[in-house]
Amino acid sequence: MSQLIDRRQNAGKKSTVNRQRFLRRYKSQIKKAVSEAVGKRSITEIDQGEQITIPAKDIYEPQFHRGHGGHIERVLPGNDNFIAGDRIKRPGGGAGGAGGNASDSGEGEDNFVFELSREEFLELYFEDLELPDLVKKELARISTYKTVRAGVTTSGIPNNINVLRSMKQATGRRVALASPYKKRLKEAEEELERLKQLTNPDKIDLLKLERDIEFFKKKIQTVPFIDTIDLRYNHRVRVPSPSTQAVMFCVMDVSGSMDEAKKDIAKRFFILLYMFLTKNYEKIELVFIRHHTSAKEVNEEEFFYSRETGGTVVSSALELLNTIIEARYPPQAWNIYVAQASDGDNWNADSPYCQELLQEKIMPLLQYFAYIEIMPRHHQSLWEVYQQVKERYPNFAMENIDNVADIYPVFRELFKRKTV
């Protein structure tokens, strides 16, 4: 019998190669559409696909066709209305338009619309972050473990005895050991009953059968009801498992020195952190805190796009952060992560208080604190006090970001797996 081996990498989708060629050819137009889509999305919706619209004029390809000039004489077969030399007026046509009213002239064409998959969308969105291909598919994760049942075993502690399986094992053993004697007992009893029905039975045969019956009964009775070899114990193993829930605090400085470019870098960093956490936890909650001289909890829209601004007092955000944790997210039930983005500016007298808040109140409650400073490397007082916090707490990490291309290398450094 013949067999066909298909080594094509299209996974049953015959248009995969054409689709990839299309994405490469119109990459600039698609990336522009992706960037516009990201601006309209929530952080929690960033890992979904997207419907992309490209103007028809942008995907126009040059083609060979007959020119409009010159003199052409044509006689069509079966024509009885025209003869050679007759001039036929070109028919008019309606122009395509985007409005609701029809046009009285010209031609038009609809925009080209197609769906980007989740993988294609993320590939294009994170391309300028210089993500390694393997890391795009699976970010490094810090696993927790849980104990799960993995069948039964013949050894263990009394607390783990599986009574049902042990009794089934004992029943099977008793049946296996007693069955031969029960069979011979039944045969002996039937033979004894047959001999007793005779007029003159042989007394020696009767005595022998009675002794055999007594022997078989004793053998059956000596089979123990349960033995140590019958015992079965529940077997449990430790397997990697995501913790049930986590909360991610996004803290951002919105003072006058944080322009839109810096806020865009911060948003991309927060998106990466959110995607990292969703791979490790079943339930993620987001808390957005923005601050200048004062801090407040806001929704995502206000967090990124509000025009409120002012000076810089970082401690106001840390105080609010601590208050929210104490009120809503007990560390015993939540894995708490904090990501703070700032340009490093802070009122000098406030920085020591920030250090005190972090060291004495906040850091003991957290799973991880990641601080990114978005500016060239001339650091101020906030960076200096944060370095002292980093020396005391290994779960405090801080890095500097100069431009968009630095986001992922910094993220990888902050969240890489720690070797023992």
Swiss-Prot record:
Q: Where is the composition biased (Gly residues)?
A: 91-100
Positions of region (Disordered):
83-107
Question: Which cysteines are cross-linked by disulfides?
Answer: none
Q: Record's superkingdom?
A: Bacteria
Q: Which PANTHER family match?
A: UPF0229 PROTEIN YEAH
List, alphabetically, the HAMAP family matched.
UPF0229
Q: Which family does it belong to?
A: Belongs to the UPF0229 family.
Protein name in UniProt: UPF0229 protein LPC_3097
Recorded source organism is: Legionella pneumophila (strain Corby)
